Amino acid sequence: MSQKTIRVGNIEIANDKPFVLFGGINVLESRDLAMQACEEYVRVTEKLGIPYVFKASFDKANRSSITSFRGPGLEEGMKIFEKVKKTFGVPVITDVHEPWQAQPVADVCDIIQLPAFLSRQTDLVVAMAKTGAVINIKKAQFLAPQEMKHILKKCEEAGNDQLILCERGSSFGYNNLVVDMLGFGIMKQFEYPVFFDVTHALQMPGGRADSAGGRRAQVTDLAKAGLSQGLAGLFLEAHPDPDNAKCDGPCALRLNKLEAFLTQLKQLDDLVKNFPPIETA
């Protein structure tokens, strides 16, 4: 099966190439935190030879509670991303929530992300596709992997084939998510790069009444399981103080564990990508 390669700057993204890391923090809590986190990600990924894209949200528009922290907003968020790009020379990715945001975000960010909860919103999908930017499409918790072909088709019909698919878990009853490992193979059949959002797959949505809980202790186990499928990349959030993070702290890796974590995953990815294919159909 041929696999499509997406290029972001000098980074090549494909299921049969070394994995790329979309890594950062959940939300732009502050400019200082974004710079601190990106500095550590850059240090570790350069040391290990992992292609890297910084990620964060300028607005968390789907928080459980009306009082939850959402972020700095579009204008300030884009200023922070510009500072990160200028300082560290890395591409950036962030999510878009409304059609009018698509072009202003694409003007600054190298990859724009379609949120899982909004992945069937045609007006948003088309607006994002028409920017011509690379799009990371999060698979909704309520969609089967084979249904992603319809979202891909919407983007393609709008003239954009610079697309990435991203698994982030499926609803399993109330307040729980599971990851169907067979789904990765199904999505890879579309030939676009497939990523695994291990952080949000660890969520327990609404598990803390007014916010999501999570299972940080299992991040290494789940990440290894995902990358063993031979994927284009990993989507990860890390925080210097997860217990006091303003969003999704229970799912975030401790930033001081990043090097040990990625060292093992790099070794696993190298091993898996060197296996010859076995035809079992």
From Swiss-Prot:
Q: Which domain of life is it from?
A: Bacteria
What EC number(s) has UniProt assigned to this enzyme?
2.5.1.55
Establish whether keyword Cytoplasm is in the entry. Answer: yes
Q: Which reaction does it catalyse?
A: D-arabinose 5-phosphate + phosphoenolpyruvate + H2O = 3-deoxy-alpha-D-manno-2-octulosonate-8-phosphate + phosphate
Where does this protein act, in terms of pathway? Carbohydrate biosynthesis; 3-deoxy-D-manno-octulosonate biosynthesis; 3-deoxy-D-manno-octulosonate from D-ribulose 5-phosphate: step 2/3; Bacterial outer membrane biogenesis; lipopolysaccharide biosynthesis
**Family annotation (InterPro entries):** Aldolase_TIM, DAHP1/KDSA, KDO8P_synthase
- Give the Gene3D superfamilies listed for this entry: Aldolase class I
Enumerate the UniProt keywords alphabetically. Answer: Cytoplasm, Lipopolysaccharide biosynthesis, Transferase
What is the enzyme's main class?
Answer: transferase
One Pfam family matching this protein = DAHP_synth_1
GO-annotated cellular components: cytoplasm
Q: What's an example Gene Ontology biological process for this entry?
A: keto-3-deoxy-D-manno-octulosonic acid biosynthetic process
User: For this UniProt entry, what is the primary localization, expressed as one broad class?
Assistant: cytoplasm
Establish whether keyword DNA-binding is in the entry.
Answer: no
Any one Gene Ontology MF annotation carried by this entry is: 3-deoxy-8-phosphooctulonate synthase activity
- List where this protein forms a coiled coil: none
The subcellular location is:
Cytoplasm
State the similarity comment. Belongs to the KdsA family.
What protein name does the entry list? 2-dehydro-3-deoxyphosphooctonate aldolase
